[in-house]
UniProtKB/Swiss-Prot annotation:
Compartment(s) of residence: Cytoplasm
Record key words, sorted: ATP-binding, Cytoplasm, DNA damage, DNA repair, DNA replication, DNA-binding, Nucleotide-binding, SOS response
PROSITE patterns per record: RECF_1 (PS00617), RECF_2 (PS00618)
InterPro entries (alphabetical): DNA-binding_RecF (IPR001238), DNA-binding_RecF_CS (IPR018078), P-loop_NTPase (IPR027417), RecF/RecN/SMC_N (IPR003395), RecF_2 (IPR042174)
Biological process terms in GO annotation: DNA replication; DNA synthesis involved in DNA repair; double-strand break repair; SOS response
Protein name according to UniProt: DNA replication and repair protein RecF
GO CC terms in record: cytoplasm
Disulfide bonds, paired cysteine numbers: none
Keyword DNA damage: yes
Function: The RecF protein is involved in DNA metabolism; it is required for DNA replication and normal SOS inducibility. RecF binds preferentially to single-stranded, linear DNA. It also seems to bind ATP.
Molecular function in Gene Ontology: ATP binding; single-stranded DNA binding
Pfam families for this protein: SMC_N
Residues engaged in binding ATP: 30-37
Amino acid sequence: MSLRRIMVTAVRNLHPVTLLPSPRINILYGANGSGKTSVLEAVHLLGLARSFRSTRLNPVIQYEQAACTVFGEVQLTEGGTSNLGVSRERQGEFTIRIDGQNARSAAQLAELLPLQLINPDSFRLLEGAPKIRRQFLDWGVFHVEPRFLPAWQRLQKALRQRNSWLRHGTLDPASQAAWDRELCLASAEIDEYRRNYIKALKPVFERTLSELVELDGLTLSYYRGWDKDRELQEVLASSLLRDQQMGHTQAGPQRADLRLRLAGNNAADILSRGQQKLVVCALRIAQGHLVSQARRGHCIYLVDDLPSELDDQHRRALCRLLEELRCQVFITCVDHELLREGWQTETPVALFHVEQGRITQTHDHRE
């Protein structure tokens, strides 16, 4: 799938604009602070109903405006189109509409418009807390395994019940045992989906990484959140007293992690910033391949400041891999001359100059 049309109103410093992007490569260039990243933020808002720059949405709404709105016309892989719209009012009301109907949740947006973000904060995937890697993992599982979301919702409900009981002791023994059973059943299902996903992801990631950079010995492994040699029911029973003292459940899928190691060390501790960026890109591109295989569709990639941290050789390699995905890509940079070479002649490339919030489409640099 791809975005055929994007309409943006009152998002940060952007002037109201309607964009007709290329179904493949789109390059947004201009000076720092011109609004390039805000375009990516608008697309992200359309696909996930949240910003990647702020946990609060009020800063996204343009000064002295009551609301921001993003509308998108999506070209579906199987043919036809779907119309998506999100609107956020300054008072807090959030509206999501799909083909003229109010959506039940942001998950419906995510399913229709699978987005991959690569930006300066992407290093957190390697350096940050396990929660960030779980989000990466679960994004991938969500898009290839339709049974994942109901199982994840069951897990969250069981965890809330158990944690409430641990803090307040409000459940009788029979109810406590019932919720523990539900927690274990949902956990086993989640663990199975995650393990299957990592099994499929690893060879694609390794192949993709090898085309970007030589990092012999880099390993990707999955920790499920409790001892691999013990049943979760046994672990919960043995840690009950400590769980009560802590007020939450310490073992289970909510503690899962992905581990990237090189020469026995955490990869983030020994890789350069450029190498870390390439590892993250390889992970994101590998996910895109799996989405294509499972859904017969494509992710949309948002790549903020692609040239940073990379020399010419690695920039070209990354662009080639993004091009080979045959998906829609939005790339920001200060100087588009850094990205002018390397695209195949038949690949449609659109250029957009961004200056003080105004966006102007310019000629394909190959013409």
